[in-house]
C-alpha cells in the first residue's frame, strides 16, 4: 500500500485517485467509485484498443496487468480483452506478428481507426515521421532487449565487428532500422543480411545456430535452451543497446489526430500504465501465468512457459530493460537521448534516399511527457 500512497498523493482530485486505486484492485469499492469510473469512461469511451507488435509476452506485461487476468481471448484474431478495474472501460490488446500479417503497429494504426494506441519503436517513428507520424506518450520499457544471437560452438563472435568478419547470415525481420545502423558502422555487411525472418525457430535450429539471428535477451536465450527441444542448448548474444543505439522500445504511441482527440483520456490512462508496470515488476506471477495460458490457447509456433516468463521478468530488471529514467520516474522520455538518435539516423536515411522521414524532426514532435505522473516509479536505493 505504501507504493500507492507515494504516487497517488501527487494526483489531483480524490475521484481520479479512486480510478487509479480501484483500477488495480488495491482497494475495495468506495463512495468515489462511480464518479471515478465515469471519469475514465467519459474520457476514453467504453473501449481502448492497443495494437502490439508480437505475441503476448512479459515485455507487454503492463498492458495485461492493466486488463487483468479475468479477461476473454479471441484466439482466431489474437485479441485479449479485460476491464480496467471496475471502471467499465475495456482494454483490448491485439497481438501482432502473424495476426497482422507481420505488419508493424504503425501501419495498422493508419489503416484501422479503431486502434487507440500502438507499440511504435522510436527509430521506426523517426523513419516514418513524415509519412506516418506518431507521438509516444509512455515507455514501459526504458531500453530495448533486442539482441543478435548465435551458437558459440559454431561461430566465434565476441563483439559486433566479429559478425561482419564471420560471414554468417544475419536473419532479421524486415524493416528493422538498427540493422542499418550496424551496417553504417561497418560491423555487419549488407550482403549478410536476410530480412525474411518471421519469428519461427526453424532456420536457427536447422543450421544448429550457425547463423546470427535477432531476438530478445529476455526471451530467446531461455526458449532456445529449454523450450525449443530441437535445439536445447545455450546461445550467446550481443545486446543492440551496447552498440550505442538506444531508441525507446515499444512505447505506446498515437497518431497526431488521436492524440488531439484523446488528451483527456491519456491524462488518466498513462498513470495507469505506469502503475501497472510497477505492480507487475513487484508481483509478476499472475500475469506471467496468464500470458502462458493465452499463448497456449493461440495455438501458434510461439511458446512460453511459467519458468521462462519468470526468468524473463528477472532479466528485464537485471539488464535494466525496465527501470526508472535518470530521475525516479518510470515511463517518461529523455528528449536529449531521443534527439541524439534522430541525429544518428538522419544520415542513414538520407543515404538510402528515403522520403518517409521529416528532415527537420525534433524529439519534442514525436514524444511527450504531458501525461506522465512523475511520482510513479520503481523503488530503488535512490528512489524510496
Please place each PLM-identified region on the residue numbering:
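N-terminal export and membrane-targeting signals
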Residues: 1-15
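C-terminal region of N-terminal signal peptides and the immediate post-cleavage residues
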Residues: 19-41
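Short, glycine-/small- and polar/acidic-enriched structural segments
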Residues: 35-197, 204, 211
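Small-molecule pocket liners
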Residues: 142-148, 248-252, 257, 341
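Short, solvent-exposed loop/beta-turn-alpha elements that line the ligand-binding surface or hinge
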Residues: 71-88, 167, 238-245, 260, ...
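Conserved C-terminal helix/tail region of periplasmic/extracytoplasmic solute-binding proteins
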Residues: 335-384
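Secondary-structure end/capping motifs
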Residues: 262-352
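Pocket-lining segment of extracytoplasmic ligand-binding domains
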Residues: 123, 197-203, 208-300
Amino acid at each position: 500500500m505504501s507504493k500507492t500512497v507515494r504516487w497517488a498523493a501527487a494526483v489531483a482530485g480524490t475521484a481520479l485517485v479512486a480510478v487509479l486505486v480501484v483500477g488495480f484492485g488495491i482497494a475495495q469499492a468506495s463512495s468515489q467509485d462511480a464518479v471515478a469510473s465515469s471519469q475514465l469512461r467519459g474520457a476514453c469511451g467504453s473501449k481502448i484498443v492497443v495494437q502490439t507488435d508480437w505475441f503476448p509476452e512479459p515485455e507487454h506485461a503492463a498492458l495485461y496487468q492493466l486488463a487483468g487476468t479475468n479477461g476473454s481471448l479471441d484466439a482466431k484474431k489474437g485479441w485479449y480483452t479485460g476491464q480496467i478495474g471496475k471502471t467499465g472501460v475495456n482494454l483490448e490488446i491485439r497481438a501482432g506478428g502473424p495476426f497482422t500479417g507481420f505488419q508493424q503497429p504503425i501501419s495498422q494504426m493508419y489503416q484501422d481507426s479503431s486502434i487507440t494506441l500502438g507499440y511504435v519503436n522510436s527509430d521506426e517513428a523517426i523513419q516514418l515521421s513524415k509519412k506516418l507520424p506518431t507521438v509516444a506518450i509512455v515507455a514501459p520499457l526504458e531500453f530495448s532487449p533486442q539482441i543478435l544471437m548465435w551458437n558459440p560452438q559454431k561461430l566465434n563472435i565476441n563483439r559486433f565487428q566479429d559478425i561482419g568478419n564471420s560471414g554468417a547470415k544475419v536473419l532479421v525481420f524486415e524493416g528493422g532500422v538498427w540493422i542499418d545502423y550496424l551496417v553504417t558502422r561497418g560491423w555487419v555487411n549488407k550482403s549478410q543480411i536476410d530480412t525474411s525472418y518471421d519469428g519461427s525457430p526453424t532456420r536457427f535450429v536447422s543450421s544448429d545456430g550457425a547463423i546470427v539471428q535477432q531476438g530478445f535477451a529476455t526471451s530467446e536465450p531461455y526458449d532456445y535452451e529449454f523450450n525449443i527441444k530441437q535445439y536445447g542448448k545455450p546461445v550467446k548474444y550481443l545486446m543492440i543497446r551496447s552498440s550505442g543505439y538506444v531508441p525507446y522500445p515499444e512505447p505506446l504511441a498515437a497518431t497526431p489526430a488521436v492524440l488531439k482527440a484523446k488528451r483527456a483520456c491519456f491524462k488518466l490512462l498513462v498513470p495507469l500504465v505506469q502503475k501497472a508496470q510497477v505492480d507487475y515488476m513487484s508481483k509478476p506471477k499472475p500475469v506471467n501465468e496468464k500470458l502462458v495460458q493465452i499463448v497456449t490457447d493461440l495455438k501458434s509456433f510461439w511458446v512460453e512457459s511459467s519458468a521462462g516468463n519468470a526468468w524473463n521478468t528477472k532479466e528485464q530488471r537485471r539488464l535494466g530493460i525496465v527501470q526508472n529514467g535518470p530521475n525516479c520516474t518510470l515511463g517518461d522520455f529523455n528528449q536529449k537521448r531521443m534527439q541524439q538518435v534522430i541525429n544518428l539516423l538522419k544520415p542513414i536515411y538520407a543515404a538510402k534516399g528515403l522520403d518517409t522521414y521529416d528532415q527537420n524532426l525534433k524529439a519534442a514532435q514525436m514524444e511527450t511527457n504531458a501525461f506522465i505522473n512523475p511520482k510513479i516509479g520503481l523503488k530503488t536505493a535512490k528512489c524510496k
